[in-house]
Amino acid sequence: MKEKGRLLKDSFIIGATGLSLNLVGLWFNIYLSGTLGTEGIGLFQLIASAYMLATTFATSGINLSVTRVVAEALSLPETRKTATRRFRKCLAVSAALGGFACLLLFVFSGVIARSVLCRPETEMCFRILAFGLPFMSAGSCLNGFFVAERKAYKTAIANGTEEICKIVFAVLVFALHPPTSLVSGCVGLVLGLVGGEAVSCILAYAFWLADEKTLPRSKGGTAGTVRKMLAIGAPVAASSYLRTGLTTVENLSVPVGLVRYGMTDSDALAAFGAVKSLAVPVIFFPASFMYAFIKVMIPEVARAYTLGKTDAIRERGGHIIRLTLVFSSIVTGIFLVFYAPLGALLFDNAETGKLLLYLAPLIPAMYVDGVADGILKGMDEQVAVMRYNIYEAIIRLVVVFTLIPVLGFAGFMATVYAGNVINTSFSLARLRRKAGIKTEPFGSVVLPTCLTVAAGFLFKSVFSFWQSRFSVIVEVFITAVLCAAVYAFFLFPKLREKIRASSPRQNARNRVRRNIL
């Protein structure tokens, strides 16, 4: 019971922080759409896509490998006292990797701007972004340590500080020097991004210095730490390098394909920016609490895997997958019903709200893919995850080159669907094969979606008299709470028993039995 309480507490901390940060981030994206326009956001997304290659090189595999190395060291009595020294080695490797990535990006920023983006004016953005890589690499390592140490609140505070600082710095830059062009706006954004990374890393390092004084120390051997770190992180890194490379090519090719279809360059950038920076963040916004469970459960699955507790993996993993599918299906139903008023409320544009409708059926696959990958990584199945990510990236790239020039925006949507469905299918099949975790599509996806759609239309008609753009908030809230309560009643037997036990009829029966006795 104490263990479950701790897990729920950690999940709540990370989830509440993630929800708050996503809300702030969503506001910031909407603010940017008004400041730079969707075309400016699209240009920044292209810069970010190219920048992903450098961030992947600087951080890929670090967080997971540090979490695994430290969690395994802390779980065994004979290695517990060496956890701090093992982490120091991991931090040194991370810092070196981040510094090298910084040097590479700074030197080749001009080549990337001219030859990759074909926009020489963006060179300054890459030069500024290079200085954020060492902070990003070290911060990823430090956050991995906090997760392994079961101190989720420190990761939450560091990440929260980072996101808030990014936004505050960018808004200050725009206030002091209003953007006069798309590129000047992007420069303001990257300045905020680098500033946020630096503050977050410094804060996380201060947390670690305080923790180091309380952890047990030993002069025991730590040989093999770097080798183990590389063994865990290398497959993830290799997958990320290849997948990020393919994803970068895909993202850079989408506007090109839309132009070939017949769109203007401005319209193509605007469409790309609307999907990546407006619709997708809204789609993933409700998942904050769900992804909190992933971060907390990875070290738990790693410990269970280390100790050979396959039943625990199957029970916990199956429960998480089932909850994820039900939760994502409720979200799907809400977007299917309320896409238009949500678009008008969030973007002041019902047409942009249609993007929520187009992406809504894909939400269960989007959500459960991240959960399944997290469980598999905890079971030392990162090589399989690597393969599936590569398969997805290749398929998406093929669809980009073949369908977008022919179908335009519909081809863009086909790209998103094809990759997510295939990757999720592979991951769930692997979980079933390795851990016996099964899924029930009808009970976990179809029924909750239909229930939510029915409830949504019901409350939409009930509140039809309320002609306000904010009425959708009440309608969505009531629909979500009702559907979640109904499914919680069926999914949690203990909760169902408590409700029945506290009912007036059951209380009357209990009194009669006591009187008879």
Question: Which residues fall in each region the model found?
Answer:
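Helix-loop junctions and terminal segments of transmembrane helices
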Residues: 60-75, 283-308
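Signature of the first transmembrane helix
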Residues: 6-67, 102, 106, 132-133, ...
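Interfacial segments at transmembrane-helix termini and the short loops linking adjacent helices
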Residues: 109-129, 335-366, 370
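Hydrophobic transmembrane helix module of multi-pass membrane transport proteins
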Residues: 98-245
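Transmembrane helical elements of multi-pass membrane transporters/channels
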Residues: 10-25, 192-208, 223-299
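Membrane-proximal transmembrane or re-entrant/amphipathic helices at the cytosolic face
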Residues: 460-517
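N-terminal membrane topogenesis motif
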Residues: 1-24, 85-88, 220-243, 311, ...
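Short runs within selected transmembrane alpha-helices of multi-pass transporters and secretion channels
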Residues: 21, 25, 29, 60-67, ...
